[in-house]
A protein has these predicted regions:
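C-terminal amphipathic helix plus adjacent low-complexity
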Residues: 131-167
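Acidic, amphipathic alpha-helical patches
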Residues: 31, 65-67, 130
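Catalytic donor nucleotide-activated moiety binding site of glycosyltransferases and closely related
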Residues: 24, 30-61
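Donor nucleotide-activated moiety binding/catalytic core segment of transferases
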Residues: 47-89
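A nucleotide-sugar donor-handling region in carbohydrate enzymes
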Residues: 1-28, 48, 65
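Catalytic binding pocket for nucleotide-activated donors in carbohydrate/polymer assembly enzymes
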Residues: 84-85, 89-141
Length: 167
């Protein structure tokens, strides 16, 4: 059964821009020097600030730009929660997953993301991991072409059928 996605995601038109979207619910300053040293450009959410520093553009969580940034991202670097990961797959975005420590669901999500060839997982971002991820973007993009993105009708039909069987 495919994931249920919010309508705002289903309405988006995915493009492949230049920026990599970084989304962290808890700021981790240790990743900033790694991102700065990279030749890529990043749009970063989760550091409770806005502004630009070299190749990094900071935006606050809840920004009105978020959905547009997600739709136009070249790739995603984020924790491995189900919602964002599902949205990224729907939009065919390669994903570097940083599962939250001791969160089994996130570790499992990240494991399968990597196993299916849609991205990589790592416990901690390093320059080597980032370089490896960036070098494999075209491989992940090609693999994502085989992902069968669906609207919510299939999932809702399965849920309706299951509820009727239980009643």
């Amino acid at each position: 059964m495919p994931p249920i996605l919010r309508q705002e995601i289903l309405d988006l038109k995915a493009t492949s821009g230049k920026n990599i979207l970084v989304y962290l619910t808890a700021a981790d300053d240790s990743i900033l020097p790694i991102l700065r040293a990279s030749s890529a450009t990043y749009t970063i959410y989760g550091f409770n600030r806005s502004g630009r520093e070299a190749n990094l553009t900071f935006k606050k969580l809840g920004s009105k730009d978020y959905l547009a940034d997600l739709a136009s991202a070249k790739a995603i670097i984020a924790t491995a929660g189900f919602s964002l990961l599902s949205e990224a797959l729907y939009l065919s975005k390669p994903y570097l997953a940083l599962p939250i420590k001791n969160q089994f669901e996130q570790t499992l999500n990240a494991y399968y993301l990597q196993k299916l060839g849609y991205g990589l997982m790592t416990e901690k971002l390093s320059a080597t991991v980032l370089k490896n991820f960036l070098a494999k973007l075209s491989k992940f993009e090609k693999k994502l072409l085989s992902y069968k993105a669906q609207n919510n009708s299939t999932a809702l039909a399965v849920l309706d059928k299951t509820i009727k069987e239980l009643l």
